From Swiss-Prot:
Pathway: Amino-acid biosynthesis; L-histidine biosynthesis; L-histidine from 5-phospho-alpha-D-ribose 1-diphosphate: step 1/9
Enzyme Commission (EC) number: 2.4.2.17
Family (UniProt): Belongs to the ATP phosphoribosyltransferase family. Long subfamily.
Subcellular location: Cytoplasm
One Pfam family this sequence matches: HisG
Function text: Catalyzes the condensation of ATP and 5-phosphoribose 1-diphosphate to form N'-(5'-phosphoribosyl)-ATP (PR-ATP). Has a crucial role in the pathway because the rate of histidine biosynthesis seems to be controlled primarily by regulation of HisG enzymatic activity.
The protein's name in its UniProt record: ATP phosphoribosyltransferase
Description of activity control: Feedback inhibited by histidine.
Catalytic activity: 1-(5-phospho-beta-D-ribosyl)-ATP + diphosphate = 5-phospho-alpha-D-ribose 1-diphosphate + ATP
Main location: cytoplasm
Organism ancestry: Bacteria, Pseudomonadati, Pseudomonadota, Gammaproteobacteria, Lysobacterales
């Protein structure tokens, strides 16, 4: 980990993503959906942007925050758990915040949780005083223990955290949990959630004030158009003027109805709905006067 350093001038935006692992493929798919394409180098660590001056650097996920802090990369797609861990570690040694989460991306969800042996009777954070807690996220854990006023020993491990209590090297663990199957296999029970994590787009606290700043703004806008619309549906139908208010009451969770003129005295209406529309809901709209109902998926949009 290093303090923020001045990086050589660049006119191309550079994004760091995981070379391999659970975030790698979704990250590349998301950026491709934003209209980016690349030419890969022979070592497959650097991808030169062809559609736009936006290049990819393929690295380990725990290197991404440092690359942003040092100005080597402008943006990165990384788990919030990794970003928050390194940010907490920087603060604990007196370094300023050098990066921030700009957008949640809706994939790679997991939780950073305390897990105790199944025979424990969990009574709350005060119970942890004097215990040994194994974790790969020591900075987040130390910060949380300090907030709780609990004095416990943090045992830092780089992997296989869940086996530490069985080996006698720790009393409990603080680790990432997705399905919980690994905890159950090691006779551990989750008892407290420290962090809800997902993949995020991270960037420097201060955006570049050159051409890269404009590229960053454009990419953020495109990301919003892809991510925010992923689960939304465009609903289109016809209705007479006297049925519009009643139909709007059935769509209170949707965006305001857009009215478009149509032949025969009817209106063409459309709205964006937050999620799938069931057959039951469509039939309810039909009974209220909607005709020619159509539900369309939205691949991307610009607000």
């Amino acid at each position: 980990m290093s303090a923020t350093q001045a990086a050589p001038a660049r006119d191309r935006l550079r994004i760091a993503i995981q070379k391999s692992g659970r975030l790698a493929e979704p990250a590349r798919n998301l950026l491709s959906a934003c209209g980016l394409s690349w030419r890969e180098s022979r070592d497959k660590l650097f991808c030169y942007g062809e559609s736009l001056p936006v290049d990819l650097l393929l690295v380990r996920d725990d290197d991404i925050p440092g690359l942003i802090a040092d100005g080597v990369c402008d943006l990165g797609i990384v788990g919030r758990n990794e970003l928050d861990e390194q940010a907490a570690a920087r603060r604990q040694i007196g370094l300023p915040d050098a990066y921030q989460a700009l957008r949640g991306l809706g994939f790679g969800q997991c939780r950073l949780m305390l897990a105790v042996p199944e025979e424990w009777q969990w009574q709350g954070p005060a119970q942890l005083a004097g215990t040994r807690i194994a974790t790969s996220y020591p900075a987040i854990l130390k910060q949380w223990l300090a907030e709780q006023g609990v004095d416990a020993q943090v045992v830092e491990l780089s992997g296989s955290v869940e086996i530490a209590p069985r080996l006698g090297t720790a009393d409990l663990i603080c680790d990432l949990v997705s399905s919980g199957a690994t905890l159950r296999a090691n006779q551990l029970a989750p008892v407290h959630n420290l962090l809800d994590s997902e993949a995020v787009l991270a960037g420097a606290v201060r955006a570049p004030d050159d051409a890269r700043g404009a590229l960053r703004s454009m990419l953020l806008r495109r990301l919003d158009g892809v991510v925010q619309r992923q689960d939304r549906k465009l609903l289109m139908f016809r209705a007479s003027e006297d049925r519009v208010d009643a139909l709007a009451q059935l769509l209170v969770d949707a965006e305001p109805l857009v009215r478009l003129p149509a032949d025969g005295g009817a209106l063409r209406l459309q709205t964006m709905c937050p999620g799938p529309l069931s057959w039951q809901r469509m039939e309810e709209l039909e009974r209220a006067g909607a005709q020619g109902l159509m539900v369309l998926s939205v691949e991307r949009s610009l607000a």
